[in-house]
Regions:
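A short acidic, Gly/Pro-enriched loop at the edge of an enzyme's catalytic core
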Residues: 51-66
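C-terminal alpha-helical "lid/dimerization" subdomain adjacent to the S-adenosyl-L-methionine
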Residues: 96-154
Length: 162
């Protein structure tokens, strides 16, 4: 399992013990906190690496699956990140994204567009549209589940059909 944008390792306790995890992040400071969590929880199945998710230092089809939580709308090149995730995941493997995407509801979508400049300065895109993003990468959602009250955050699971 590859976790892209592992940050401080918030998800690490959620993975089953038999699952080998490779976590990457661009931020050394975040990785230091994740490493503390690895040591604290005695997670021998976790490897952490500093890496740009748009140019991953992994071979093609190296992972069974990949996940990115709260990452895709916070990176400068979400298409590049998803392309790389697709490249390193084996055919038939899962690509899971938990993220905020632009709402399909017209009023909410317009509000997200209006606040987008402020959100961008804060480090994330409030109006990132899901469907065009996935189409550019050649992915289609098998599962698309809304995960909060306002339906802006969605759990997307795609099967890598190369």
């Amino acid at each position: 399992m590859l976790e892209v944008g592992i940050g401080t390792g918030l998800n690490l306790p959620l993975y089953p013990g038999h699952c080998r995890i490779t976590g990457i992040d661009l931020s050394e400071e975040m990785l230091e906190k994740a490493q503390e969590k690895v040591v604290e929880l005695a997670l021998n199945n976790v490897t952490l690496k500093a890496m740009d998710a748009t140019v991953m230092d992994f071979g093609d089809d190296e992972f069974d699956s990949a996940v990115a939580t709260y990452t895709i709308s916070a990176v400068p090149d979400p298409v590049g990140v998803l392309r790389e995730m697709r490249r390193v995941v084996k055919p038939g493997g899962g690509i899971v994204v938990l993220n905020h995407f632009r709402s399909h509801r017209p009023v909410v979508g317009r509000i997200e567009d209006l606040v987008a400049p402020v959100c961008t300065r804060l480090g994330w895109k409030s109006n990132l549209p899901l469907e065009p993003l996935l189409q550019q990468v050649g992915l289609a959602p098998e599962i698309d589940t809304k995960v909060n009250l306002f339906n802006g955050w969605r759990l997307i699971k795609c099967v890598n059909r190369k």
